Amino acid sequence: MGLRKLKTDEEFKHLIRPLLRKEYLQLEQNLLADGCRDPIVVWHDVIVDGHNRYEICMRHGIPFDTKDMEFECREAAIAWICANQLGRRNITEETRKFLIGMQYESEKVVTRIRNKIGKNQHTVDISSMNDEEADKACRHWTAQRIAEENNVSAATVQ
């Protein structure tokens, strides 16, 4: 535990619903009373989860742990943030739809990168397909998986 200097990425922070004043004050009281129990999640010293905890801990000198995550690229980090936020109860339906869309768009980019370097995560052989067919197949699989994870239709995701 310590007071490690971390960086904030505005795009990452924007994906996380800001706390209401009451929620922020409650978090601050909890951190002052109990310390920081959950680690700040980071990718190359950039916060991907725990922006509010980090801000409060730094202001009050509260030690915190970090959990270093490894992502293939920025889009993979964005997809993780979206999926993580979708698991929370305090998001509006509008925010939920936005996050599902951002996760889908980010994962499409990650899939394209993986396909170019031969790390396709699907068992179906797409090597015989042209680039357009392979891209369409990967978009379909990605949309289907995200839809199932969020109890919506694949058409809603796309």
Kindly label every feature range from the protein language model:
Residues H44-D49, R53:
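Acidic, metal-coordinating catalytic cores used for nucleic-acid/nucleotide bond scission
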Residues F12-E28, L32-D34, R53-Q158:
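Amphipathic, charge-rich alpha-helical segments that serve as recognition/docking helices
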Residues R4-K7, V41, D65-E70:
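General small-molecule cofactor/ligand-binding pocket signal
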Residues R17, V42-W43:
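A generic secondary-structure micro-motif detector
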Residues C36-P39:
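N-terminal BTB/POZ boundary and linker segment
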Residues G2-L3, K13:
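Charge-dense, helix-prone N-terminal extensions
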